[in-house]
Amino acid sequence: MLTIDLGSLSYAEAEAVQTARLGEVSTGGEDTLYLVEHPPVITLGRNGGIENLHAGRGFLAERGIELAQSSRGGNITCHFPGQLVAYPVFRIERRPGGLRSFFHDLEEVVLRTLHTFGLEASRHEGRPGVWIDNRKICSIGVAVRRWTTYHGLALNVGRDLSLFNLITLCGLPDAEATSLHRELDDDSVTMQEVKDVLTRQFLAIFTHPAVAAGEAAL
């Protein structure tokens, strides 16, 4: 598995990077994990979500917030500096369990990452992503083309979650956003530390599929 840190990159540019790599991975290239932070952007998934946006295009444009249609699954969400986004461009044709197992394993990567930092999170049946009670700390939305995944997960790290005030998170009125720093009440964990742990968990889960789900590999 290759891991490439894209630094800060616009949503459209990151999607172009993924789709270019997808063609290579789907024909035998090595699975590739991209890590990135995006400038402020609100994205709409294949399930729509414009009805859950509470600001007009003019309001967003004045504040430098992009609005983008995405090919990923799911509803509305947002990305911003201080949120770690991971895009696994992985071939899943021969992976046991197919896309359902892949999605479960993405959640497992995040659960183990948070556990490393002392946070116990969980899955919620029927509500994709990773949660701490009713607070969503990580959104997940993927797309598949030619048996190869793209898009992925967005883990909130920093305290500033103000962009979420402009949307109904994932179309769920009772859900609220949270982050690693908020839950720890401690801002000392760096983005690089989170990247390092998340990458290790991707390696543990996706290159060692025999490891039982839920068994910490810390």
From Swiss-Prot:
Coiled-coil blocks: none
Active site per UniProt: C170 (acyl-thioester intermediate)
Compartments where found: Cytoplasm
Pfam families: LplA-B_cat
Iron listed as a keyword: no
Chemical reaction(s) catalysed: octanoyl-[ACP] + L-lysyl-[protein] = N(6)-octanoyl-L-lysyl-[protein] + holo-[ACP] + H(+)
Recorded metabolic or biological pathway in which this protein acts: Protein modification; protein lipoylation via endogenous pathway; protein N(6)-(lipoyl)lysine from octanoyl-[acyl-carrier-protein]: step 1/2
Keywords annotated in UniProt: Acyltransferase, Cytoplasm, Transferase
Domain of life, per lineage: Bacteria
UniProt key word Protein transport: no
Residue intervals of the BPL/LPL catalytic domain: 27-210
Site positions for Lowers pKa of active site Cys: K136
EC number: 2.3.1.181
UniProt-annotated binding residues for substrate: R72, G73, G74, N75, I76, T77, C78, H79, S139, I140, G141, G152, L153, A154
Any GO molecular function: lipoyl(octanoyl) transferase activity
UniProt-listed GO biological process terms: protein modification process
Stored InterPro entries: aa-tRNA-synth_II/BPL/LPL (IPR045864), BPL_LPL_catalytic (IPR004143), Octanoyltransferase (IPR000544), Octanoyltransferase_CS (IPR020605)
Misc note: In the reaction, the free carboxyl group of octanoic acid is attached via an amide linkage to the epsilon-amino group of a specific lysine residue of lipoyl domains of lipoate-dependent enzymes.
Function field: Catalyzes the transfer of endogenously produced octanoic acid from octanoyl-acyl-carrier-protein onto the lipoyl domains of lipoate-dependent enzymes. Lipoyl-ACP can also act as a substrate although octanoyl-ACP is likely to be the physiological substrate.
Family listed: Belongs to the LipB family.
Stated name of the protein: Octanoyltransferase
Annotated gene: lipB
